[in-house]
Amino acid sequence: REVAGDARHGDFEAQQFRPQWRDPARLAQLVDAIIDLANDGLDPRDYHVEVLEAFRTELGAATMLADGEQAALELLATDPLLLARYHLYLGKVAPQTRSPQWNFASRPVSVERGFEAVTAALASGRIQQTFELARPQHAWYQRGREWLKAYRALAAAGGWPGIPDGPTIKPGMNDARVPVLRAR
């Protein structure tokens, strides 16, 4: 899914149609920020991460991309920057499509402020920060990100330690499995 062409055109116009993604370090920041979206429960593959990784490798090996490749990179890199900010700010799924009783209003969206944030991120080289500013700032959301990251690390390390089979352990019982259970 791509952001509407008008939105990208507005961003390119704000940048005076200058290429923004020639610097491999800037592209690396974008790729890293997109990969980190997994900690928000978003799938980095929805934001062209594989193609951007390939461009990052190619850009690191070449001094310049061909004009057509550079134009493709501009579109492919700007699109997820705008789209991910939108998803972080408002969510990826319209909640009323999942629950007809949904009665919360969405946060207001300012396209101009979004472009300003993207322009500032590109000018300062702080790609991750533009995602940080779009995320919900609630403490519970930040804790959720931390928990998701921790659980994914636990799963990558092999998951919870197993508990040997045996009878149900009830409060006050002594059992050789209790220390293993406590360690979990």
Task: Place the predicted regions along the sequence by residue.
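Auxiliary tRNA-acceptor-end handling modules of aminoacyl-tRNA synthetases
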Residues: 1-184
